[in-house]
Amino acid sequence: MNFCPLGNHKHFSMQDDIKPKKKLLLATIENIDQEGRGVTHINGKAIFVEGALQGELVECESYVKKPSYEIAFTERVIRQSNLRVKPKCEHFNRCGGCSMQHFEFQAQIAAKQRVFENTLSRIGKVKTETILTPLAGPSWHYRYKGRLRVKFVVKKNKALVGFNEKRTHFIADISSCEVLPQTLSDILPQLQDLITQLSIKDKIPQIEFAADQNHLVLVLRILDVLNTNDELLLNTFSSQHPVQFWTQSKGPDTIKPLSPRDDVKLSYALKEFGLRFSFMPYDFTQINPFINQVLVRRAMSLLKPSKDDRIFDF
């Protein structure tokens, strides 16, 4: 029933102040999919549950609903798996940069192997004879190539640099990252402050990064021209921190160092084979250089090349 308070002609409803309760699903997680989500079935319908582990009993809320499946996120863990660990990153529950920090590392590898074997068998119809031991590298600060979103938020008077928040298109406000190169993670707050000071702070949508063991290159995607003071700020920053700035104004052919001192040579080495490969910040390289070295070593041990053989990596 509507009513009109004295002195106010606006109509109100008794239900205006009552927020609808969340519709939570109670689910027992049956297994893990290729994206690290828990999988369950309710009334025959597949539900993919973010943040849930096999064997757990959780309350979850669906946010994507399709005729044949739903995607949900974990609201509360009622019965916890012994493989659940505390995420190392303080931003994990909000930032969408990674999704499995709650899952013990060796258990992650085992789960991924099961998914891989199941895919070979169920989809590829391949019967495996021998399964090699999975390869693994460092679990933290391994991502040496990638892209960060940038957004200047007027209300905060602050430039955000990072990944999208989980389940939104907004950029997560983070001060560090456990998967980025350590040098980049360490300077994230200062980098955000630097972007905030630029005259074109609202004209920089993204930053691509490329790193090796000795250098970190940040390629600023700029939609307007940097003025003299902007260049001074960037040059001063790179002289005080282990970073070199490059810019990209249009297509890939416009990528260039901000100044001659930023024109560094990136490289990665395969020391046991006496090889060192140089690459540019915009070249394709493996995101994880550590696992790449292990892969090459494994491939060479399986190939058993003679001294006259030549091996090509395509």
Question: Can you describe what each PLM-predicted range is?
Answer:
Residues 4-314:
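Accessory RNA-recognition modules of RNA-modification enzymes
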